[in-house]
């Protein structure tokens, strides 16, 4: 991968390594590859919608492209990069641990992911693809898809789920057992806290998804009737089970980005800790906790009674409180800093701005009376893309910008990286901001054609997506150029406020051969 430590043993290092840095690098490469495939599919969607009329010629094909785009981006791009990549690389370093708690389990949890991805790609090529959307609702996924594509998608989700659960157990035990004795819970860095809460949510919610899709599998193949109303089942059970996983999942995607933004704001300001760091920890815990009890706000239109809708509306609005605490704490941390024009500052400010917009549209959608009108329109699509495409993905870009030199030992071109930010910022906003208006005017999701009245919004969105794709290519060029340019990372301006910066410059193959005792932290008594 890079010039910071020599690999011995060729290919077997990548296949068999139990070193957290090697496995983290594999996760990054896998996430990049999946992200490129997912982005290509999103471009296909935007080209189809660029003007009225048909490009793909089949609604089933269009829906299977949407399904593949969602599953690739969620399970094979954001999660491997955030938790597998940044988590594997930085968590042991931030805890003063020599490696992960179960190094070989770590290796297994990575190699389950390419298997899962090949299965979901196979599903796209069987019987006109799996056109169910990533939610895989019955009866569309049972009677509506009699072929093998949905079965392949279910096996893919099983593989990805097992991988995530194994990784989550590993991260939890590492945080609990391998923490340096001088780092108490309240002194752990916020990135470690976000990863810890994230993996807790994974362990809590993924078995529920596994149960739901296993029941779906038996409904399809073994003549059971869990979700078939004609024989006493209820498709709403599936929706409740799926969204009990699906809502914590969106917090699983965004929480590590919160941690990255917290670390970046420390880096930028040179402060010892984030403003209100204990409050930030409680906000992370609150988001994780409340995120588990609001799942049915995805289901306002299925005929829930008024009391249930009132509860889920209120509970969903409560999540805005800890999220607001985080946003204002980041701003308070950045307040008073010496403003130096650099890519990291741009990414952090961009994240805070875009995530806040996504959060505000979320507060609107949490109202059940409004959501009944806006449900399954492009307003919802714009909301979750502002939180994920412009939140989690900007978090990944921020993490790469922050830790690139730390991980590789090379320095990227700062002006080029700033150009990537400007292009990406313009592109994603041009893509998703106009679609809010299309959604308010009643433009529904998951249709491959539309009336001419919506064409202005769609043309703007399609141009924006092309700008974003160009920005992505420029980003990859910047990273490759940093290797080719071979500008060695010599020193940093960073004020030392974490165990990872006690290492000499960039990172070598094995860190913390003996336990460090981190003396600038208040000791536990």
Curated annotation (Swiss-Prot):
Role description: Component of the cytochrome c oxidase, the last enzyme in the mitochondrial electron transport chain which drives oxidative phosphorylation. The respiratory chain contains 3 multisubunit complexes succinate dehydrogenase (complex II, CII), ubiquinol-cytochrome c oxidoreductase (cytochrome b-c1 complex, complex III, CIII) and cytochrome c oxidase (complex IV, CIV), that cooperate to transfer electrons derived from NADH and succinate to molecular oxygen, creating an electrochemical gradient over the inner membrane that drives transmembrane transport and the ATP synthase.
Primary location recorded for the protein, binned into one broad class: mitochondrion
Gene Ontology CC, one term: mitochondrial inner membrane
GO terms assigned for molecular function: cytochrome-c oxidase activity; heme binding; metal ion binding
One Pfam family in the UniProt entry: COX1
TM region(s), chain numbering: 25-45, 71-91, 108-128, 152-172, 190-210, 241-261, 274-294, 317-337, 344-364, 387-407, 420-440, 459-479
InterPro entries membership: Cyt_c_oxase-like_su1_dom, Cyt_c_oxase-like_su1_sf, Cyt_C_Oxase_1, Cyt_c_Oxase_su1_BS, Cyt_c_oxase_su1_dom
Gene that this polypeptide is encoded by: COI
Catalysed reactions, as listed in the record: 4 Fe(II)-[cytochrome c] + O2 + 8 H(+)(in) = 4 Fe(III)-[cytochrome c] + 2 H2O + 4 H(+)(out)
Organism: Ascaris suum (Pig roundworm)
Residues annotated for Cu cation binding in this entry: 247, 297-298
Enzyme class: translocase
Membrane-protein topology: Multi-pass membrane protein
Binding site for Mg(2+): 375-376
Residues given in the record as Fe(II)-heme a binding sites: 69, 385
The protein's name in its UniProt record: Cytochrome c oxidase subunit 1
The protein's assembly and partners: Component of the cytochrome c oxidase (complex IV, CIV), a multisubunit enzyme composed of a catalytic core of 3 subunits and several supernumerary subunits. The complex exists as a monomer or a dimer and forms supercomplexes (SCs) in the inner mitochondrial membrane with ubiquinol-cytochrome c oxidoreductase (cytochrome b-c1 complex, complex III, CIII).
Cofactor note: Binds 2 heme A groups non-covalently per subunit. Binds a copper B center.
PANTHER family noted in UniProt: CYTOCHROME C OXIDASE SUBUNIT 1
């Amino acid at each position: 991968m890079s010039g910071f430590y020599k690999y011995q043993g060729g290919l077997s290092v990548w296949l068999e390594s139990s070193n957290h840095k090697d496995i983290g690098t594999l996760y990054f490469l896998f996430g990049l590859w999946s992200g490129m495939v997912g982005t290509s599919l999103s471009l296909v969607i935007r080209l189809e919608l660029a003007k009225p009329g048909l490009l793909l010629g089949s609604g089933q094909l269009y829906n299977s492209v949407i399904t593949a785009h969602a599953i690739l981006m969620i399970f094979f791009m954001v999660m491997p990069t955030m938790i597998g990549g940044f988590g594997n690389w930085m968590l042991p370093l931030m805890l003063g641990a020599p490696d992960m708690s179960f190094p070989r389990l770590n290796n297994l949890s990575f190699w389950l992911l390419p298997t899962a991805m090949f299965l979901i790609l196979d599903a796209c090529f069987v019987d006109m693809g799996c056109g169910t959307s990533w939610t895989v609702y019955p009866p569309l996924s049972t009677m509506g898809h009699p072929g093998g594509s949905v079965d392949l998608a279910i096996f893919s989700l099983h593989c990805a789920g097992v991988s995530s659960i194994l990784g989550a157990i590993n991260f939890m035990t590492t945080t609990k057992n391998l923490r340096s004795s001088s780092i108490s819970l309240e002194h752990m860095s916020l990135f470690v806290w976000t990863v810890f809460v994230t993996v807790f949510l994974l362990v809590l919610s993924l078995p529920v998804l596994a149960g739901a899709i296993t029941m779906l599998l038996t409904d399809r193949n073994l003549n059971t009737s869990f979700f078939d109303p004609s024989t006493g089942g209820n498709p709403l059970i599936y929706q409740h089970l799926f969204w009990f996983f699906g809502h914590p999942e969106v917090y699983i995607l965004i929480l590590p980005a919160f941690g990255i933004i917290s670390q970046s704001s420390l880096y930028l300001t040179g402060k010892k800790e984030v403003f209100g760091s204990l409050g930030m920890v409680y906000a992370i815990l609150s988001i994780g906790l409340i995120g588990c009890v609001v799942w049915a706000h995805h289901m306002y239109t299925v005929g829930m009674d008024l009391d249930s809708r009132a509860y889920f509306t209120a509970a969903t609005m409560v999540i805005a409180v800890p999220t607001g605490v985080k946003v204002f704490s980041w701003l308070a941390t950045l307040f008073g800093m010496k403003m130096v024009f650099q890519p990291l500052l741009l990414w952090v400010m961009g994240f805070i701005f875009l995530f806040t917009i996504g959060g505000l549209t979320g507060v609107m959608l949490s109202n059940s009376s409004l959501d009944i009108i806006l449900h399954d329109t492009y307003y919802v699509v714009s909301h979750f893309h502002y939180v994920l495409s412009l939140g989690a993905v900007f978090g990944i870009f921020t993490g790469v910008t922050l830790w690139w030199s730390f991980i590789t030992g090379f320095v990227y071109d700062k002006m080029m990286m700033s150009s990537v930010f400007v292009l990406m910022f313009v592109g994603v906003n041009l893509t998703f901001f106009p679609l809010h208006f299309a959604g308010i005017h009643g433009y529904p999701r998951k249709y491959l054609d539309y009336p001419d009245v919506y064409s202005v919004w769609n043309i703007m969105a399609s141009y924006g997506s092309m700008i974003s794709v160009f920005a992505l290519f420029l980003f990859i060029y910047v990273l490759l150029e940093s290797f080719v340019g071979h500008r060695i990372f010599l020193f940093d301006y960073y004020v030392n406020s974490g165990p990872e910066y006690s290492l000499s410059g960039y990172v070598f193959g094995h860190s913390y051969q003996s336990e460090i005792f981190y003396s600038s932290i208040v000791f536990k008594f």
